[in-house]
């Protein structure tokens, strides 16, 4: 609207993509868009390898961080099968909840199997965080025979999800034998690590714009979070993730700054005006 109001024709053309499902895997969002795009005749395709792709889905409070790399997102699902019985006769059952608790602690030791560090990222290591736990029994007086939990893994580039799965199975086999239960572990969801060259044209253009608008020295960084930029990079499209945000997502008092949003728009306009 501002470009039209000022009758300005920028050096670069502007395209906006709005998509759904970013929080739940992108199957019905950008992944769907890219799948349909690949099916178009060559002359109708609108995504080009020499375009700039900027995803405003991550950043820092100062605006200095330009995300160029993402860890692999790998979710493990762990199913523990024991024997259900009345809680007053625990000797008749196999408590899957207790075995599951031991399995949680075993999964938290996975970092010892993958100790490599990369200073581009914060934190600089692969992370293994037990997160969601499914409901087991509806009543307090029931010893649970089944327990399910999930582990959120963020893996540095070069750490293969299949190797993490193998390591988890080795550790959980010992837990299963000790508690007399069966433990199955599988990859529930996986988004591979992705990277855009730190000296790519889109990053260079963003650095110039951020320096002029925010008066800070922009720098390339890597993150553990997963954004739709990974899907673009997997298609050979150079994507940079940038915005000025307070990084309060998924926590109490989640918020954004209108002032920062307006200045972010100035950064995007700056990129459009560069030759």
Give a label for each model feature.
Residues 1-69:
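Acidic/histidine-rich catalytic neighborhood of metal-dependent amide-processing enzymes
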Residues 24, 58-62, 68, 74-275:
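Metal-dependent amide/peptide-bond hydrolase catalytic core
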